[in-house]
Amino acid sequence: MNVKSIALSAVIATSFLAAGAMASEKTEPRNEVYKDKFSKQYDSWHATDESKEVVDMLEKVPSLVVLWAGYGFAKDYNAPRGHMYAVTDVTNTLRTGAPKNAEDGPMPMACWSCKSPDVPRVIEEQGEDGYFSGKWAKGGPEIVNVLGCADCHEKGSSKLRMSRPFAERAMTTLNTPFDKASRKDKQSMVCAQCHVEYYFEKTAERPGFVKFPWDMGTTVEQMEVYYDSMEFSDWTHAVSKTPMLKAQHPGYETWKLGVHGQNNVSCVDCHMPKVTNDKGRKFTDHKVGNPFDRFEETCATCHSQSKEFMVKQVEESKQKAQDLKARVETQLVKAHFEAKAAWDAGATEVEMKPILMDIRHSQWRWDYATASHGASSHAPAEVLRILGTSLDKAADARVKLAQLLGAKGVKQPIAYPDTSTKAKAQAALGMNMKTMNAEKAEFKKTLVPKWKEEAKKREATYK
């Protein structure tokens, strides 16, 4: 190449950089780019920031600390907020630790997977192998835009898409591939990219990859068999030594089991209805929320009953589930501590195995029924059924434990520690919350600002 050619190449390269790089061929993660073209949708989506309140669920239900002993949720668990807080909340939670650099911290990259349209952007740029490799902190400078347009829509379009390849594979597993689905089905499938049960693989070929456990089906029993068949556990319980499963948020699976799912009423129909603006134009309201807040556009399009009647029905279903949920939690807390007493008394692994399996199955079913949040509305009968089987499993475990403790000469009832508050429960487990909170504060003060600065510089190169 001669001098003139080299000079010309340099000019072309410089011009390209000056013009800016594309965010991604398929994904524009910056939600504000769509503000003008889709103004009504953008403004309503932005209104999800109104759910500002942080509700500490461990304060409200201290038994959760014991149920998740040894797992990150025992440190910190708040009620979910609007989509606008997805990145903020995963950054602030104690569950993601206080990493000091990109290679540090307790959690994998997969923890970002449902938080941002930057996730599909990075997957497109690096492949799934590149995206899923490494620690959660590696993604800090990359995953900065909150859940929004590109998570559910094709670039520059209102057309729906599956932006996560692991979710697309899961739909194919159910013989319902996204590209063959109706628009009505797609309106729920895009939500099912995140509002589902999933786990992080532990295989050598796909370490830390997100997978939906749907190979045998989507019911609580089918997924239980799936997990048991490969002896998978999310963690070992710090008190009972049970190989535990942590349900995420199986909203899609429980919706499918209820009257709405079985009649093809989509997530969008109830949570993102068509509304009319002040100019008389209809659009899809992207302020994802409670259907009762927009009753005339949601429930009233199918139901003839009054809002008051419908609210009462839902509240009664919710209360029944809450009452049964609390009973299960009481039994499981005691089962975990009784299992510890059995171990301390010299119980063997052979003696404990069936007991731990009962505890595992009971808590998995309890978590499946409650972690999906809206399941008592989506599938109230199924939730009560599942919680009933959970209570049975917890009772089975405690009966076996009573027999084993008696055989070991342990006086019953055993002495249970005071777990009546979040602080007392965490103290009973030996958790140093003062240190954890101080480390988290330092992380937010030192590393997070660097992430934001790196992201700002990167996005400044985009067109």
Curated annotation (Swiss-Prot):
Q: Which domain of life is it from?
A: Bacteria
* PROSITE patterns listed in its UniProt record: MULTIHEME_CYTC
Binding residues for substrate, per the UniProt record?
Y198, H249
Where do the annotations place Ca(2+) binding?
E197, Y198, K246, Q248
Q: Where does this protein hold heme c 4?
A: C267, C270, H271, H378
Q: What is its main location?
A: periplasm
Q: Name one GO molecular function term.
A: calcium ion binding
Give the residues the record marks as binding heme c 2: C149, C152, H153, H286
Name of the protein this chain belongs to:
Cytochrome c-552
